[in-house]
Structures are given as C-alpha cells and as structure tokens.
C-alpha cells in the first residue's frame, strides 16, 4: 500500500534521507530495502539481534523474550504502524527521532528532526 497523496513533504523527505544515511546514522542498522539489519546475522538462519543498551530501549521487554534481545524493526510502511518501538512507548515518529537523537547524542536540529520524520513517513 502506498502512502496517501500529500502525506509527506517530498523535499523534506529527500533531506531526511541524506540525514538517515549520514549524520543520524539510522542506515547503519535500518538497511534498505526493508530498512532492517535482521538478515545480517552470523548465518542465514540466525538474525542479528541487539542488546537493549545498544538502542536505549527498556530492557524489561527484551528480558521477557527467549533471546533477551531486540531485532531491528523493518521500517517499510512505518507510517501505518503507530505506536512505535517494541512496547508501543513512542506515540509518534517525532518521539522516535527524539529518542534516538538523545540516546546517540546526535545533536540534530529541530529542522533536521522534521526532515528525518518526513523521510520515515515516505518509506
């Protein structure tokens, strides 16, 4: 399913894509075309998983799983799947971007964050 017409700003999304793959470092884990790194595990049958500390997520949710870790969520059609994060703790894409900006000390400006959100809405 495609995004509804006019649901994101194309110019801002283009700037956001550059941030996603550059200064924001999102593309190091969220790799196209699915925007996930789950297939980059040690072998074809073992997904790549992350400790909660790597992502800044609450470890309580991961500790209830068999692996005690998180997988990188694919971002395709992300605009359809609010709330975000494994526990639904981020109500908006803005909250997601703010979380990672803080956790990774990225220092993104308000305009950069807005562009990044527009890119995420375009996936």
What residue ranges belong to the model's regions?
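Electron-transfer interface patches adjacent to heme c in soluble/periplasmic c-type cytochromes
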Residues: 1-123
